[in-house]
Amino acid sequence: MEAMGEWSTGLGGIYTEEADFMNQLLASYEQPCGGSSSETTATLTAYHHQGSQWNGGFCFSQESSSYSGYCAAMPRQEEDNNGMEDATINTNLYLVGEETSECDATEYSGKSLLPLETVAENHDHSMLQPENSLTTTTDEKMFNQCESSKKRTRATTTDKNKRANKARRSQKCVEMSGENENSGEEEYTEKAAGKRKTKPLKPQKTCCSDDESNGGDTFLSKEDGEDSKALNLNGKTRASRGAATDPQSLYARKRRERINERLRILQHLVPNGTKVDISTMLEEAVQYVKFLQLQIKLLSSDDLWMYAPIAYNGMDIGLDLKLNALTR
């Protein structure tokens, strides 16, 4: 108990020294909130006496009493909890006697305090943001569903149109083939000695679209007229003017005529032979002609005439290469 008494008396002396120092310090400044220096000294002394009675249980903070551009006033003696400061929240409302005065100041940590209205507006805005996002997502889903349904309807309509066009074209192809079969009957031409049958015309199948159907009928009628004009009285077909003037067609015609003449000669040599017999005969003839050419070259040369009997017996000793070198 004696130690506690000594400690309380020591604290009382410290409080009195701080109170005297603060009275001297604050007396030199003007009070911005309308308070006088006498009032502040009175409050400080009252605060000091109250603290000395509580045995140091309530400490006077130096930060709240320092002059930082706003009013530093002490609470009344009747209230016990207004002197405590929070470490995170600094208020800017202070009671001077029975009157209250609001002083605009920044926080001790350097952060500015926002009014309650702006805090409420920000809270409402943050609450409304998810609602707006939900509405936008629902609108986008509805729009995508509408577009997908439109695309499906368009695809179905295009498929139906394609099927209808295919059905029409198939019907027209069937009709054209029937007309060609009717027109492709056998035609007979009379000769001086008798009648000769001509080959029936093959049915022509043509597919045309809706726009080309009208022009196709006229084109077929023109072709029938040209074919009828090309038929001669003797039954021989004559080439049209365009084919007659083409040089490739003339060359092909002459080549066919030559081949036919040679085949007739071979048929006379082998009257009852087939195509295989004629081909083998031609190969043997070619080999015999080559043998004769070799014999003539060997016998006509002064250096190689002695090899003629060896080549005659069918031995290949590379004489063909030597003969080619000599001729060069």
Curated annotation (Swiss-Prot):
- InterPro entries recorded: bHLH_dom, HLH_DNA-bd_sf, IND-like
Tell me the keywords, alphabetical order.
DNA-binding, Nucleus, Transcription, Transcription regulation
User: Where in this chain does the record put each bHLH domain?
Assistant: 243-292
One GO CC term, this protein: nucleus
The organism's superkingdom is given as Eukaryota
Q: Principal localization?
A: nucleus
Q: Locations of Basic and acidic residues compositional bias?
A: 220-229
Q: Which Pfam families match?
A: HLH
Region feature Disordered, mapped onto this chain: 145-248
Location in the cell reads: Nucleus
Q: Name one GO molecular function term.
A: DNA-binding transcription factor activity
How this chain assembles, per its entry, is: Homodimer.
Tell me the protein family, please: Belongs to the bHLH protein family.
What this protein is called in its record is: Transcription factor bHLH84
What is this organism's lineage? Eukaryota, Viridiplantae, Streptophyta, Embryophyta, Tracheophyta
What is this protein's gene name?
BHLH84
